[in-house]
UniProtKB/Swiss-Prot annotation:
Reactions catalysed, as given in the entry: lipid A (E. coli) + a 1,2-diacyl-sn-glycero-3-phosphoethanolamine + H(+) = lipid A 4'-(2-aminoethyl diphosphate) (E. coli) + a 1,2-diacyl-sn-glycerol
Name this protein carries in UniProt: Phosphatidylethanolamine transferase Mcr-1
Lineage: Bacteria, Pseudomonadati, Pseudomonadota, Gammaproteobacteria, Enterobacterales
Gene3D superfamilies assigned to the protein according to its UniProt record, in alphabetical order: Alkaline Phosphatase, subunit A (3.40.720.10)
Modulation of this protein's activity: EDTA may inhibit activity. May be inhibited by ethanolamine.
Subunit record text: Monomer.
TM region(s), chain numbering: 15-35, 48-68, 74-94, 123-143, 158-178
Effect of D465A: Abolishes transfer of phosphoethanolamine (PEA) to a lipid A analog in vitro. Almost abolishes resistance of E.coli strain Rosetta to colistin and polymyxin B, by comparison with the same strain expressing wild-type mcr-1
Length: 541
């Protein structure tokens, strides 16, 4: 019996059988969400034949990719193991949160810090990686491969490539009308294919980064003509706080008709204007934040070249406005890169943030960014000042960590990161409690500004960088490509407040606005004009 087991264990397999086996495994285990989306779009009862051909085409594509990537004997096993691990990791986040892997999502992943990564890890993730990644990889690693001679190997490899192409092309030809509609109307469904989509996006991102590295690094100016009509020596200096929000969605704002009072403190402050129809530039922090300060607008904006483009903060700094960015999130996403480092401060640790020990998770709170702002004002006495406060806000999936106990108004709450396993209302409760903390932070920001209203014309602008999915259609978090992102990820709250003495008039609450309105708003607040955005709608008149 022992001898029989030993012989079985060392039984050799053809490299082509091994490649085909991995392709079958990845097709079946890494694409559950893809097939679920397919069955929703094409009900199996009416489209069984077509749905089966999609499975065949996907297997053909998987077989082609694995064959091409592992064509050399010394890379065969490493490549197959890498594909198995990649399939396990990417499919977990796709199946759990609805994540798709375009270049923007990959950039987000690369910029995720240790705390954010920890929020995403759990027992289910580890079990998925072991079951669908590690164990199959061990089988690949230890199986004996019987490599043919070079000539036979080449012919068989070519045969496998031809077979792969046949598996792809024949069903497409046989169901040409179906596939014409599939590729034209339902193009976003392809984004759920793992690990093919991540592989494609990695290649695309590498190409983008190479072009960026070889491109000229000179700043492209968009507002050389910018002029400030009045200076602080001609009027009261202006003090503006811009709260860059995180992951807040407009339909959970009480001002917009939400049944819960999620912004009770703002509702008590005179002069707050809520904007109910604002669309974000993108669905991720890495994409949206640079866009919020860009001159290009969402239609022209390119996240890959944004750091080499003049933004509105560069302009205001050049004109003499004192700029400060405090960050309790990740960083400024390149917005502050061209300004002196002293104008940026990291408030995600107790080094700068004085309010980090009010919760069991030792998370630094957004309100800590308000501590010590009086010192900045004193150091820039009599000057125009713009202060950016970049929130942690409602960053998921651990919404329950984003607020102190005093904001736990809605209970019970989801206290885990496997959101689909939480009772849905408990997930909503945790998210809404985090909004209460944001309400408090904005209110305190306004109250701080009011203490300086005698010496300065004071104003506050709040806009969230993007929204959030909370389980609608099985999608969680954010980061979907704009082409098919749900409205929950792009419809964001925005508020404006100004002291009555400033004479500034906000736009109507139902004005249709986007992140494109931020740059002209910041310019107007400091009496600056620039031709590039002179016709762009702002949050103020």
């Amino acid at each position: 019996m022992m001898q029989h087991t030993s012989v079985w264990y060392r039984r050799s397999v053809s490299p082509f059988v091994l490649v085909a086996s991995v392709a079958v495994f990845l097709t079946a285990t890494a694409n559950l969400t893809f097939f679920d989306k397919i069955s929703q779009t094409y009900p199996i009862a009416d489209n069984l034949g077509f749905v089966l051909t999609i499975a065949v085409v996907l297997f053909g594509a998987m077989l082609l990719i694995t064959t091409l990537l592992s064509s050399y004997r010394y890379v065969l096993k490493p490549v197959l193991i890498l594909l198995l691990i990649m399939g396990a990791v990417t499919s977990y986040f796709t199946d759990t949160y609805g994540t798709v892997y375009d270049t923007t999502m990959l950039q987000n992943a690369l910029q995720t810090d240790q705390a954010e990564t920890k929020d995403l890890l759990n027992a289910a993730f580890i079990m998925r990686i072991i079951g669908l990644g590690v164990l199959p990889s061990l089988l690949v690693a230890f199986v004996k491969v019987d490599y043919p001679t070079w000539g036979k190997g080449l012919m068989r490899r070519l045969g496998l490539i031809v077979a792969s192409l046949a598996l792809i092309l024949l069903p497409v030809v046989a169901f040409s009308s179906h596939y014409a509609s599939f590729f034209r109307v339902h193009k976003p469904l392809r984004s759920y294919v793992n690990p093919i989509m991540p592989i494609y996006s990695v290649g695309k991102l590498a190409s983008i980064e190479y072009k960026k590295a070889s491109a000229p690094k000179d700043t492209i100016y968009h507002a050389k003509d910018a002029v400030q009509a009045t200076k602080p020596d001609m009027r009261k200096p202006r003090l503006v706080v811009f709260v860059v929000g995180e992951t807040a969605r407009a339909d959970h704002v009480s001002f917009n008709g939400y049944e819960r009072d999620t912004f009770p403190q703002l509702a008590k402050i005179d002069g707050v204007t809520n904007f109910s129809n604002v669309t974000s530039c993108g669905t991720s922090t890495a994409y949206s934040v640079p866009c919020m300060f860009s001159y290009l607008g969402a239609d022209e904006y390119d996240v890959d070249t944004a750091k080499y483009q003049e933004n509105v903060l560069d302009t205001l700094d050049r004109l003499g406005v004192s700029i400060l960015w405090r960050d309790n999130n990740s960083d400024s996403k390149g917005v502050m890169d061209k300004l002196p480092k002293a104008q940026f401060a990291d408030y995600k640790s107790a080094t700068n943030n004085a309010i980090c020990n009010t919760n069991p998770y030792n998370e630094c709170r957004d309100v800590g960014m308000l501590v010590g702002l009086d010192d900045f004002v004193a150091a820039n006495n009599g000057k125009d000042m713009l202060i950016m406060l970049h929130q942690m806000g409602n960053h998921g999936p651990a919404y329950f960590k984003r607020y102190d106990e005093k904001f736990a108004k809605f209970t019970p709450v989801c206290e885990g990161n496997e959101l689909a396993k939480c009772e849905h209302q408990s997930l909503i409760n945790a998210y809404d409690n985090a909004l209460l903390a944001t309400d408090d932070f904005i209110a305190q920001s306004i109250q701080w500004l009011q203490t300086h209203s005698n010496a300065y014309d004071v104003s506050m602008l709040y806009v969230s960088d993007h929204g959030e999915s909370l389980g609608e259609n099985g999608v969680y978090l954010h980061g979907m490509p704009n082409a098919f992102a749900p409205k929950e990820q792009r419809s964001v709250p925005a508020f404006f407040w100004t002291d009555k003495q400033t004479g500034i008039t906000p736009m109507a609450t139902d004005t249709v606005l986007t992140h494109d309105a931020i740059t002209p708003t910041l310019l107007k607040l400091f009496d600056v004009t620039a031709d590039k955005v002179k016709d762009r709608t702002a949050f103020i008149r």
